[in-house]
C-alpha cells in the first residue's frame, strides 16, 4: 500500500505577482524549488493564508535568487500581490519508506529568501 505524504514545502512565501493572462501555473524562484525538492512541472497544492483558498497547479522555474512567486492564469484570481502562501508537493511512499522519509520544509523571509530548511514542523509553533 502507498500513502501520500508531504514531500516538500515552501512555508509562508509572499506573492510577488499575479498574471491572469499567462498560461496557468505558479512561477517559483528556482532556488526555492531546489531547497524544497520540488521540480519544474511538478503538481503542487497551494494555500493562501490571507483568504483561505486552496488550489492545485504545477510549477515553472523562475529566475534564481529573484524571490519570484507568481500565480499565473486562473490561479491569479485566487491571490493578490503580497498575499502569504504555502506551496506543498506530495510523494507516494510505501509503508517501509515512511519511517525514513523527512519532508523538506523551506522557511522564507518577507522577500522570499531562504531563512532555514527543516525536516519537521514542531506542533503548535508559529514559524
Curated annotation (Swiss-Prot):
Residues forming the catalytic site: 25, 58
Subunit: Heterooctamer of four alpha and four beta subunits.
Required cofactor(s): pyruvate
Lineage: Bacteria, Pseudomonadati, Pseudomonadota, Betaproteobacteria, Neisseriales
Root EC class: lyase
Pathway per the UniProt entry: Cofactor biosynthesis; (R)-pantothenate biosynthesis; beta-alanine from L-aspartate: step 1/1
Source organism per UniProt: Neisseria meningitidis serogroup A / serotype 4A (strain DSM 15465 / Z2491)
Main location group: cytoplasm
Family matches, as SUPFAM superfamilies: ADC-like
Signal sequence residues: none
Post-translational modification note: Is synthesized initially as an inactive proenzyme, which is activated by self-cleavage at a specific serine bond to produce a beta-subunit with a hydroxyl group at its C-terminus and an alpha-subunit with a pyruvoyl group at its N-terminus.
Function: Catalyzes the pyruvoyl-dependent decarboxylation of aspartate to produce beta-alanine.
PANTHER family: ASPARTATE 1-DECARBOXYLASE
Entry's family note: Belongs to the PanD family.
CDD domains, per database record: Asp_decarbox
Gene Ontology MF terms: aspartate 1-decarboxylase activity
A single GO cellular-component term on record: cytosol
Gene this protein is translated from: panD
Binding site for substrate: 57, 73-75
Cofactor descriptive note: Binds 1 pyruvoyl group covalently per subunit.
EC number, as in UniProt: 4.1.1.11
Pfam entry (one): Asp_decarbox
Modified residues (Pyruvic acid (Ser)): 25
Name of the molecule in the record: Aspartate 1-decarboxylase
Amino acid at each position: 500500500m502507498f500513502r501520500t505524504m508531504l514531500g516538500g514545502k515552501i512555508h509562508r512565501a509572499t506573492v510577488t505577482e499575479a498574471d491572469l493572462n499567462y498560461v496557468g501555473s505558479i512561477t517559483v524562484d528556482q532556488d526555492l524549488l531546489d531547497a524544497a525538492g520540488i521540480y519544474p512541472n511538478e503538481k503542487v497544492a497551494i494555500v493562501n493564508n490571507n483568504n483561505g483558498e486552496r488550489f492545485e497547479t504545477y510549477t515553472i522555474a523562475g529566475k534564481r535568487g529573484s524571490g519570484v512567486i507568481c500565480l499565473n492564469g486562473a490561479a491569479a484570481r485566487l491571490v493578490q500581490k503580497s498575499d502569504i502562501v504555502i506551496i506543498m508537493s506530495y510523494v507516494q511512499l510505501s509503508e517501509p519508506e515512511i519511517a525514513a522519509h523527512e519532508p523538506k520544509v523551506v522557511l522564507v523571509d518577507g522577500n522570499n529568501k531562504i531563512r532555514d530548511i527543516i525536516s519537521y514542523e514542531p506542533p503548535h509553533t508559529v514559524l
